[in-house]
Amino acid sequence: MNWTSENYYFTKLNKSELPELIHFYLVTTREHYKLDSYSEEAYKFDFESLMGEDQIFFDCSIYYVLRSKLHNSIYACIRITFWDKETSLPIQKLFDIETESLLIPHVTNFWHIGRFVISGKIVGNRINILKKMLFDAFYGPHCLGSGLVIAECDRKVVNTLRKLEIESYQLGDPIIYLYSETLPIYIKSEWLEAFIEKNKYSQLSVGNNVDIQKFVEMSNRMLLRSKNIE
């Protein structure tokens, strides 16, 4: 299906739609890497593993998805999570990274980005979808400032980010995860400045400011909780 605004629409995911998103993510990954031997047992293991992660992080996350207007199926997705600095992130388990290694001094807000994939069935100008998904996901970290975006990221995606003027820092050696060479990285919120400013005119929507308010409320709750613990 060709990419046009007449064929697709951007929206956000409800918690009840998580199984649909995880299925889309795994199937799209399998198709991208042409995994003809992807067994039912392997799919079930991956599905349950990712569902477990997303159920833990859903309430402090926003999932941006692209859906078809024709049959409402998901064709692209990305997740941005406001991290509480306590719950173990996927990157920590995969790369054996201690929490202390991620808590960089003088950084207030910590984020995790994931579930980023665009269906290969979309033809045409896919760069517009890419920019929109990234803009929505990165707008919160950019606006709240003093932030660090953490991710386990496919090497090709890291290279794409660099082409979009988004630099990243590699935390360790790559591994093969979900069939691709995956790097542990972080992106400082100030490194998002060029990308956000360059795309603000074409990508900013009212919904982005609504999302900012949600993240501000999360930040306030986490700050209050930490003071109560002290």
Regions found by a protein language model. Name each.
Residues 79-81, 114, 186:
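Residues in well-ordered beta-strands of folded domains
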Residues 83-85, 121, 158, 190:
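Short coil/turn motifs at secondary-structure junctions
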Residues 66-69, 187:
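Active-site beta-strand termini and strand-to-loop segments that position acidic
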Residues 52-65, 86-88:
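A short helix-loop-beta-strand connector motif used in the catalytic cores of GNAT acetyltransferases and
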Residues 91-168, 172-183:
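Acyl-donor binding region in acyl/amide transferases
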Residues 1-55, 142-144, 148-230:
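Terminal substrate-recognition subdomain of acyl/acetyltransferases
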Residues 80-86, 105:
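Acetyl-CoA-dependent GNAT
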Residues 65, 72-82:
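Conserved beta-strand in the GNAT
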